[in-house]
A protein has these predicted regions:
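Conserved nucleotide-sugar phosphate-binding/catalytic loop shared by glycosyltransferases and other
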Residues: 4-7, 26-74, 210, 293-295
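Short amphipathic alpha-helix
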Residues: 12-23
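Active-site-proximal region of nucleotide-activated glycan assembly enzymes
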Residues: 28-29, 50-51, 111-161
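Donor-nucleotide binding loops and adjacent catalytic segments primarily
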Residues: 38-49, 166-243, 277-280, 285, ...
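An amphipathic, basic-hydrophobic alpha-helix
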Residues: 65-94
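Acidic donor-binding loop of glycosyltransferase active sites
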Residues: 92-94, 239-252, 261-262
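Conserved donor-binding/catalytic loop of nucleotide-activated donor transferases
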Residues: 113, 239-241, 255-266, 286
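A short, well-ordered alpha-helix in the C-terminal region of glycosyltransferases
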Residues: 312-324
Length: 339
């Protein structure tokens, strides 16, 4: 049996789903271990690709203080012993961590049971857990690490199917990540009338916390907008879109890349180690995206960018920047290393 562990946010969970799909193609149904917190249940409770799903009461350690940090560590340690016993009982051959605090019990449980641990780091800057565990991993996968045995990001094949050659801006997507982004929502509200006058269709993923505000805003303006809080069918949304304005979580960066959607990235300013900035900077350095800091966000500059962007060449180059099949390449390494 193979275990996939990790989660908390959509970026981690999208990797888990992509790897699960690749294992399924090899007639393997992994066990999934996540957390009772975050979005893990929303994504995977009852998901048919996994043989079984287990959600443990673990929380992050980094943002805790004092006794809260000790309590969080204690929970992780207890659940690590639970995972160790489960792995031994099930005859687990390998554990694949996709990062996030939800991965801690399973990853430590694997080391305690002397089961090969494989880690995928999604961001340009290693997370603290992944940095701690990297020396003990059988293999460490990262699109930003020159020593990674597989360098392409594990994007689901659905996003490659969402590719089409874009030649002009007909539909603009505001994408704030799985939890939404107030700064991106505010920008959308500011430039929506201008977009409407230009005849540009608007798709807006605003997050649950801002859904009612967004509904009221667009109703007041009487402008047609495809508005939603969150979707599991982002590939279909990307297929409709010509250009995106988005956060720079690694999942979003590489899914937009696979679908060939040119983007303006506005990194979340409080992301650990500023990793969202560096996720997008890798593409910006190749001339494949535009990057604006949130505190320097200017609607007039955004309008100017939208008027000047060379959609056709960037769309084609983005799609060529990432190869499909990375999930299969990763599970091939996992299966070989677990023998």
């Amino acid at each position: 049996m193979i275990v996939i562990t990790g989660g908390g946010t959509g970026g981690h969970l999208s990797i888990a789903k992509s790897l699960c799909e690749a294992f399924n193609d090899e007639n393997i149904r992994p066990l999934y271990i996540g957390s009772t917190y975050g979005q893990d249940r929303e994504w995977f409770e009852g998901y048919p690709g996994f043989e079984k799903t287990l959600f443990l009461p673990t929380t992050g350690v980094v943002n805790q203080k004092g006794f809260g940090k000790i309590k969080a560590l204690s929970k992780i340690l207890r659940q690590a012993f639970t995972c160790k016993a489960l792995f031994q009982q099930k005859g687990v051959k390998a554990v694949v961590s996709v990062g996030g605090y939800a991965a801690a019990p399973g990853a430590f449980g694997a080391l305690m049971a002397r089961i090969p641990l494989f880690i995928h780091e999604q961001n340009a800057v290693n997370g603290r857990l992944n940095g701690l565990l990297k020396p003990f991993a059988k293999a460490f996968f990262s699109s930003y690490d020159v020593n990674s045995p597989v360098k392409d990001y594990p994007v689901s094949k659905r996003f490659f199917r969402a590719y089409r050659q874009r030649d002009e801006l007909k539909t603009l997507l505001f994408l704030g990540g799985s939890q939404g982004a107030k700064a991106i929502n505010d920008l959308a509200f500011e430039i929506t009338p201008w977009l409407h006058v230009k005849g540009i269709k608007i798709i807006h993923q605003c997050g649950n916390n801002d859904l009612e505000r967004a509904k009221a805003h667009y109703k007041k303006l009487n402008i047609p907008v495809k508005l939603f809080a969150f979707t599991q069918n982002l590939d279909e949304i990307l297929y409709e879109s010509d250009v995106a304005i988005a956060r720079a979580g690694a999942g979003s960066v590489w899914e937009l890349c696979a679908a060939g959607v040119p983007a303006l990235f506005i990194p979340y300013p409080h992301a650990a180690s500023d990793h969202q900035y560096y996720n997008a900077k890798a593409l910006m350095d190749e001339g494949l995206c535009t990057l604006m800091r949130q505190d320097a966000l200017d609607p007039q500059k955004v309008k100017s960018w939208l008027e000047k962007i060379e959609i056709s060449s960037i769309s084609r180059a983005l799609h060529q920047r990432i190869e499909p099949g990375s999930s299969k390449a990763i599970i091939k390494e996992v299966l070989r290393g677990s023998q």
